[in-house]
Amino acid sequence: MKILISDNISLELFCKNPIKILEKSNKGIIGVLKNKSPIFYVITPYILKKIFDLECNLLDLDKTKQQISKKFSMHPQWTPDKDFIRQAALWGITLTEEILESELASFISYWQAEGCFFHHIQWQQKLARSLQKSRSISYMSQKKRDITYIPTPDQTVPNGFRGK
């Protein structure tokens, strides 16, 4: 299972006060590094329960059998499974946030117009890839640099070079 880890910390800093560092983490997951490579991961009990709590994510057997047994075209009432983010992680697609209603509505309206028929699991995989792509595009657009910025050089001469 792939999980996106945004917080990394060195082993030395982590050993000083691990509980405080874990409490400060954004997502409750920290990668502990030694020589810039991960040696282990630390996960809060809440996040661990959220990832592996299968009991609360069980679906009705009838609904599952119906969805597995035949293909269908996209319709406005379609929703992904409750454990969709965990399933996406199993498919190698890391989703860090829940699905927004606007994202789901956009996906449904696009595929309704297409009129394609797929199994429920295939629709979920398409949704996961769509979310991954759209979120990465919006993330990349936030990181764009200002093309009108003109850098000004500093006037320092490094040691070992001839200068003023």
From Swiss-Prot:
InterPro entries: DnaT, DnaT_DNA_bind. It comes from the Bacteria. The keyword DNA-binding applies. Keywords: DNA replication, DNA-binding, Primosome. GO terms for cellular component: primosome complex. It holds the Pfam family DnaT. GO terms for biological process: DNA replication, synthesis of primer. Involved in the restart of stalled replication forks, which reloads the replicative helicase on sites other than the origin of replication. Can function in multiple replication restart pathways. Displaces ssDNA from a PriB-ssDNA complex. Probably forms a spiral filament on ssDNA. Homooligomerizes. Interacts with PriB. Component of the replication restart primosome. Primosome assembly occurs via a 'hand-off' mechanism. PriA binds to replication forks, subsequently PriB then DnaT bind; DnaT then displaces ssDNA to generate the helicase loading substrate. Belongs to the DnaT family. This is Replication restart protein DnaT. It comes from Buchnera aphidicola subsp. Acyrthosiphon pisum (strain APS). The gene is dnaT.
